């Protein structure tokens, strides 16, 4: 038997915390089916929207970064990315800004290759992924705040081995390379919502 999943109706919303990088909200919502008129509490994190970019040089190397991540207390291998700041006119602009700030690299064109919702059970944001071909370094990185980043150039055809071996574990980076594969195979045309 097939049935349609309906949206829940939010009846209350209370901000619990307002941190620098996210706010936390408790929402009370009515279940549309099943236990009629029964309300449940849900907690939602509201971080900024995010972006990341796969920069590939003319000689086929991916510009990765290594940085320490406090959530897992380890150094991770990632691609450049970060928050879409309120003053950024678009996530594409933010991706170019993050690429430049974190690596000193630029690209003539950033191509949108996909959008994901990092954790829709708990978070309200999305992450847009861009491809930057012919990326070239024009200066040293300009780190801001608590950033401590090392650039690492890796041959594009080595990336699957890094993923399979567990050297790359950041979910948004894994999704980015999946988007790249779809883009290269020309399966569909992604569009931001």
Model-predicted regions and their roles:
Residues 2-10, 75, 145-193:
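Nudix hydrolase/Nudix homology domain
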Residues 13-52, 58:
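Acidic, metal-coordinating catalytic segment for phosphate/diphosphate chemistry
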Residues 13-15, 115-119:
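Short, solvent-exposed loop/turn elements at beta->coil junctions and helix N-caps
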Residues 9-10, 106-113:
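A short coil-to-beta-strand element that immediately follows conserved catalytic motifs
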Residues 28-33, 119-139:
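Active-site-adjacent beta-strand/loop module that shapes the phosphate/pyrophosphate-binding cleft
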Residues 32-34, 57-59, 68, 88, ...:
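Short loop segments at secondary-structure junctions
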Residues 5-7, 45-47, 52-97, 145:
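Conserved Nudix-box catalytic region and its N-terminal flanking loop in Nudix hydrolases
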Residues 78, 129, 153:
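Short aromatic/basic micro-patch
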């Amino acid at each position: 038997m097939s049935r349609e999943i309906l949206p829940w109706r939010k009846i209350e919303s209370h901000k619990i915390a307002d941190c620098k990088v996210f706010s936390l909200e408790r929402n009370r919502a009515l279940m549309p089916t099943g236990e009629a008129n029964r309300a449940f509490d849900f907690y939602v994190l509201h971080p900024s929207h995010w972006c990341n970019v796969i920069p590939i040089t003319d000689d086929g190397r991916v510009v990765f970064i290594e940085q320490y991540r406090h959530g897992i207390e380890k150094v991770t291998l990632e691609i450049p990315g970060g928050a879409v700041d309120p003053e950024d006119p678009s996530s594409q602009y933010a991706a170019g800004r993050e690429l430049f700030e974190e690596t000193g690299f630029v690209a003539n064109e950033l191509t949108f290759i996909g959008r994901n919702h990092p954790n829709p059970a708990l978070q309200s944001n999305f992450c847009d992924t861009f491809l930057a071909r012919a990326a070239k370094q024009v200066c040293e990185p300009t780190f801001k705040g608590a950033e401590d980043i090392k650039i690492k150039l890796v041959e594009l055809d080595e990336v699957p081995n890094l993923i399979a071996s567990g050297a790359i574990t950041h979910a948004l980076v894994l999704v980015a390379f999946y988007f790249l594969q779809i883009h290269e195979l020309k399966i569909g045309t992604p569009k931001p919502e």
